[in-house]
Amino acid sequence: MSLGIPEREAEVRLALDRVTDPELDEPVTDLRFIERLTVDPDGTVSIGFRLPTYWCAANFAFLMAADMQREVATLPWVRQVKVTLGEHMYAEKINHGLANGLSFQATFGNEASAELDELRRTFLLKAFQRRQEALLRYLIERGHQPAGIALIELKALPLDAQGARLRTRYLEKRDICAKPSEPRAFVDTCGNPIEDLNPYLRTLERVSINAEFNGALCRGLLAARFNEDGEPTLLEFARKPPRAA
């Protein structure tokens, strides 16, 4: 039985939930970047998205747009995905590249320093670190000893709902750094064993704090730019207390 338009729209939104801001590792849907979504009976999906400022980096914008196209195109009934960026200094150029199936390098020519693969890899590693830190701190807070934590059998470990969610999110990124045959639950970004957990955690914390700072700033800028209620203002961001150690 074919799906109706509302069901297809729901599937598209679920696909967009898998697309993250590369720096923040948060879904573009949660960040309220998606401004418009339409599904036509012929299987054409049109997505309009926005960013917090007119000057957001072109490579970030292109990366997110390409990821939206890729994820939505995996739905079996989709025939075409049109992604359009609005109110951005490079919107015309980015939209032209997306509409014509061009790479970032082909779209920007000499203005592009490199293709997106290297940038994507950089932010995948940061996402790995943030998710790893969240799970490690959860386990330590619940009594697991740092000395043996790397050898925990994660998949068999009984966890509550919060822990299960943290485990799932971490395992989604674990293979970025660890080989499938790697017996240790936790390795560093080079795939090496973690020799001393405490200084390693401090390194991870710096990555997380930076991402939290950028996330709060992003939401504040988005709310200020589009004059929306319900989002933190820049003043509230400035007053945000430091994260507990």
Over which residues does each language-model region extend?
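Domain-level signature for proteins that mediate thiol-based redox and metal-cofactor handling
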Residues: 1-54, 59-245
